[in-house]
Regions:
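Bacterial N-terminal signal peptides that target proteins for export
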Residues: 1-10
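Predominantly soluble domains enriched in secretory-pathway, periplasmic, or organellar proteins
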Residues: 4, 21, 25-389
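Bacterial N-terminal signal peptides
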Residues: 9-19
Length: 389
């Protein structure tokens, strides 16, 4: 494939030149590439059998020139929010949820729900698959606790949350919390005492209490916007933001919102909404807490739709306490999914599924600028998360 100016091509060589010491000293990013689903000119899914998916570990010591540390042949899925993987707070392991696979029935291909969660040993040189956890149906968004002792996995089809115990690379399901509705993502508050889960089809966010490895659904829900797909919590734990997708996981031509939940109120509730565009999916907040972004699909995978745009875009938000305002927008690539900030908050990466690359933005305070640089990945980036350090 011909690379455009400013695009940094990766070598997908089997031999990996980086040492483990270099990897562990630098921020690194995990990326899930799904090679099973694309779309035709009428916007209909074109499916392929599994076997070409990959999970990448990338060294971001130089954010403008990311380097590949590992390319693991592991199945993962674009079906769901782009947060179906995460890196432990200490950087020792990563988890990847395999949400949906594809099988052949007669002459047709069909999507089938999976239940697997991959455990990747990031201390190994190079990083490698350390184990497989069998969870519930359609594991999707997931997050580690701030201490790294447990992780929570949103099981969409099972309408539950799996609680995983983490002891090195020994990861086990120790509990399953029934939620009563389809759950797409779950995140912890910074103090580790609460968690928030998006009830996608119910248009709500559920509140959970966390006490050690005991996770309890409080039966308290916050009504947000339509089809909340993704949720994040500010670094100070005072507010949460939801990506209200509006179109049940895709664009529909209508503008959608980010809801702001004040977590200091009792009970927590929505205090404002910001219009961000058609089909927000990726969602991220800077480690400094003053800038957030919503990644907008904008019908970029549906050429036949009246609302089609060739490119998706990123809506940049200024966060000042519990006040969130829209600053600007930037075009990115086709069907943008994940957004991640580097640990120092100075750079933002946005994955473009159809373009098979990431856009790189510079962040200076609340000023976000497009560097004009992109880096290619060997596949279609469906999800991404960043290490904490």
């Amino acid at each position: 494939m011909r690379c455009r100016t400013g695009v940094l091509a990766f070598s997908v060589a089997i031999g990996l030149a980086l040492s483990l010491g270099t990897v562990r000293a630098a921020p690194f990013m995990i990326v899930g590439n799904d090679e099973k689903v694309l779309w035709d000119d009428q916007g209909k899914p074109v499916m392929s059998l599994p076997g070409k998916d990959s999970v990448l570990i990338l060294d971001l010591a130089d954010p403008l020139n990311p380097r590949m540390v590992a390319n693991l042949s592991l199945e993962n899925s674009v079906v769901g929010p782009p947060v179906n993987l995460d890196i432990a707070p200490d950087g020792s392991i990563a988890l990847v949820a395999d949400s949906v696979t594809i099988v052949k029935e007669g002459d047709a291909l069909k999507q089938v729900l999976s239940d697997k969660i991959w455990v990747i040993d990031l201390k190994a040189n190079p990083p490698k698959l350390a184990g497989t956890v069998i969870g519930a149906k359609q594991p999707s968004g997931l997050s580690f606790s701030p201490s790294g002792d447990i992780a929570l996995v949103a099981n969409r089809a099972d309408k539950s949350i799996s609680v995983l115990s983490i002891k090195g690379t020994d990861v086990k399901v120790i509990d399953t919390v029934a939620m009563g509705d389809e759950i797409s993502q779950v995140v912890f508050t910074p103090d580790g005492k609460r968690a928030l889960a998006t009830k996608f089809a119910a248009h709500k966010v559920a509140l959970l209490e966390v006490n050690g490895d005991k996770v309890t659904y409080t039966k308290t829900d916050v009504t947000v916007g339509l089809w909340p797909y993704n949720v994040i919590v500010s670094p100070d734990g005072k507010i949460a933001l939801t990506a209200d997708n509006g179109g049940a996981g895709s664009s529909d031509g209508n503008v959608d919102t980010v809801s702001i939940i004040d977590l200091q109120l009792k009970p927590p509730r929505v205090i404002d909404k910001v219009v961000v565009g058609d089909g927000p999916e990726g969602l991220a907040i800077s480690p400094k807490g003053n800038v957030a972004v919503a990644v907008i699909l904008a019908g970029s995978n549906n050429k036949a739709a009246f609302f089609h745009r060739d490119k998706g875009y990123v809506t940049v938000l200024h966060v000042d306490g519990n006040k969130v305002t829209k600053i600007k927008e930037f075009d990115v690539g086709g069907l943008p999914e994940a957004a991640v900030f580097t640990p120092d908050g100075r750079y933002l990466m946005v994955g473009n599924y159809l373009d098979q690359d990431f856009s790189i933005f510079k962040v200076d305070g609340t000023d976000v600028t497009d560097t004009g640089k992109r880096f290619k990945v060997p596949g279609h980036p469906a999800s991404a998360r960043m290490s904490l350090h």
